């Protein structure tokens, strides 16, 4: 049986989407630098004839696959948006206008309206920031090891909050809001645990990404912000940081099941439509 797969070759992770024998949407995930594993997986799955590929690392991977398969290239955001629209329909979300924030190695933010889109902006702060600072500050360099520690860590000994500054005096904004990420590290002597450091790193990333998304949502008068990306996968703590901050600003956050695979899904759908 001839099969088609969609590949999103990102800066950190490469995601593959395909329909299995039961026509169920199925996913595989590899580190992008482990290209031999990606190629081996494709070669070991007999019947693959066509590959639609997108993402920043797509050219490099395409060079390794050319000649053996029919290759289709697809613009990265077109693939992502197609995947997001598919998931929205599957999850029965009736939303046409929204801010789409994709937290990958870095973060890109798009304004989507009536199935059209424009790039609103982005930031170099994203999943790559979490992993880079985790390595520098704690020498932990695997995402799977970082996430459990962020769940048990505390930001209280490292972040300065509005309440810390006002010291019990009535403040003009919520005392629990962060006034300075890692601000206490410069003014207190403390031997912080790895879990506290990682929780604070993730807090910084979550707040920066959310603040930018909120600014764009406010500018366009948009209620819904859809957050996707592999950085959110099984990352309940980061989702909580983003969700609480978004809701505090009276916007509605949406986290899609399999949102991190949107690019691969969109690539697959493009090749099989």
Curated annotation (Swiss-Prot):
It catalyses: (R)-pantothenate + ATP = (R)-4'-phosphopantothenate + ADP + H(+). It is found in: Cytoplasm. Its EC number is 2.7.1.33. Pathway: Cofactor biosynthesis; coenzyme A biosynthesis; CoA from (R)-pantothenate: step 1/5. Keywords: ATP-binding, Coenzyme A biosynthesis, Cytoplasm, Kinase, Nucleotide-binding, Transferase. Gene3D superfamilies: 3.30.420.40. GO terms for biological process: coenzyme A biosynthetic process. The keyword Isomerase does not apply. One of its GO terms (cellular component) is cytosol. GO terms for molecular function: ATP binding; pantothenate kinase activity. Its main location: cytoplasm. The active site is at residue 76. ATP binds at residues 8-15, 105, 127-131, 143, 230. Coiled coil: none annotated. The keyword Ligase does not apply. SUPFAM superfamilies: Actin-like ATPase domain (SSF53067). Transmembrane segments: none annotated. It holds the Pfam family Fumble. PANTHER family: 4'-PHOSPHOPANTETHEINE PHOSPHATASE, PANTOTHENATE KINASE. Belongs to the type II pantothenate kinase family. Homodimer. Catalyzes the phosphorylation of pantothenate (Pan), the first step in CoA biosynthesis. This is Type II pantothenate kinase. It comes from Bacillus cereus (strain G9842). The gene is coaW.
